[in-house]
């Protein structure tokens, strides 16, 4: 499975997507990292993260044998992602808070996502919006699906 988006690619984010609604599983979201203290600013464009929503508020998330489980049920993923070599902090079941999301990188063994204990918490207040379109590179213009392949 190739990465859906690469560093430096330009995307369009719908900032109104989640004004009335909440992110859904499998949607690709853009978000700022959570501030570690009140003086830290988190709204710099260079700090924007883009990941796929895997777990929703209040759900129990676990990764075992390379598979994602939500509330004890194995999830049949929409795309053909590689099996995860490590569940990180999700080896043990995690219960998400009422405003917390569990996100995964499409490059499943990257570990730069909610499995990593040092990765930022993703809460609704930090979500910028839904990634709806890739603009650059021009050869891959279109929706940011996991089926897209990087061309040489």
Descriptions of predicted regions:
Residues 1-152:
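Extended hydrophobic leader/signal-anchor segments used for secretion and membrane insertion
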């Amino acid at each position: 499975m190739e990465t859906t988006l690469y560093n430096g690619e330009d995307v369009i984010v719908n900032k109104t997507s989640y004004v009335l609604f909440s992110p859904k599983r499998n949607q690709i979201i853009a978000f700022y990292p959570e501030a570690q203290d009140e003086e830290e600013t988190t709204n710099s464009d260079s700090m924007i993260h883009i990941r796929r929503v895997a777990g929703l508020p209040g759900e129990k998330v676990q990764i075992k044998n390379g598979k994602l489980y939500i509330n004890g049920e194995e999830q049949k993923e929409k795309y053909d992602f590689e099996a995860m070599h490590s569940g990180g902090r999700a080896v043990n079941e995690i219960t998400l808070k009422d405003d917390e999301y569990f996100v995964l990188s499409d490059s499943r063994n990257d570990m730069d996502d909610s499995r990593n204990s040092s990765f930022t918490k993703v809460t609704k207040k930090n979500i910028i919006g839904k990634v709806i379109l890739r603009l650059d590179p021009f050869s891959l213009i279109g929706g940011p699906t996991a089926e897209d392949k990087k061309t040489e």
